[in-house]
Amino acid sequence: MPQKKLLNMLMAGKDLAREEMTLCMNNIMDGAFSDIVLAALLALLQKKGVTADEAAGAYASIMARATLCKLDEDAVDTCGTGGDNTGTFNISTAAAIIACGAGVSIAKHGNRSMTSQCGSADVLEALGFAIDLPPSATEELFRQTGFAFLFAPMYHPSMKAVAHVRRELGIRTIFNMLGPLLNPAGVKRQLVGVFEPELMDLYGTVLLATGCRHSLIVHGETETGAAFDEPSISGPTHILELHEGVMARHIVHPEDFGFIRCPIEDLAGGNREENAIIIRNILDGSATRAKTEAALYAAAMTCYVSGKASCIDEGVCMASDSLESGQASCKFTAILQLNRELSGKHKALIN
């Protein structure tokens, strides 16, 4: 489709068919559009709102170009959309570490920050984790520790064509929305935080179509009702649960699981070094109650979708034990040590 026609369609608020979106994304990934046209496309698509067909079409284009990683389909991804502008620390990353300490296999897909100060890749790097392991080394790390971090640019090299425009725009785009759908390990269990409640059904449709076994799509609210793309200890959390092809909706509150409400400001993060300190403090027991409970809440849901906990309450017990017993800290130390060894071997080979 000519770019002028495409822009006019989006300006008129018209939706693209799945096949049209696949062709559009092919052109984006091939660098066929100038930066100005690409920025306009992303902004107009965001303003119009992405449909399930458009998401599926874009997914098909991007995954056709992805480098895949052979892990366990029952591993859990805790990748969220980001873009909620709350400025919190990296809750889902802390939750992934805690859940891994509880025996949950983690295949976390993530990237550097595009719309916030610190993405999951940034904070892991600040914690001493080499994010750029090749797939073979990542598979070995997962085999030995049950933890993998899948750095998006390593597995989606075609995304490089849009990275600078996304960074310059600094707004939510279809790529924020697509991120959790693009795990190169093909995981079937996910905890997905979304920045808009309208995205919940869209995710449900796409995840079911891609063979999801058990996922929780969550949209939290702060104490003022502002959007939060994590399970919220500041207000209610809306959940769309997908389990073996069945959808169910829930609304839960932090008090339901023994957590104490706090203002969103109590979960404030900072730059990568500051967020790394927060995660270290959570692991060693010196973090504030609010930050610890925010991480535990997300870790509990991670344990639940993994199948190791039969409900979120049991997940809270598993996550709390992982943290309080020191299992999470010990596990992360082992992950970092093996990660460094594998990174060193890889660098020696390429040099």
Swiss-Prot record:
Binds 2 magnesium ions per monomer. Anthranilate 2 binds at R166. It comes from the Bacteria. GO terms for biological process: L-tryptophan biosynthetic process. One of its GO terms (cellular component) is cytosol. 5-phospho-alpha-D-ribose 1-diphosphate binds at residues 80, 83-84, 88, 90-93, 108-116, 120. This is Anthranilate phosphoribosyltransferase. It comes from Chlorobium phaeobacteroides (strain DSM 266 / SMG 266 / 2430).
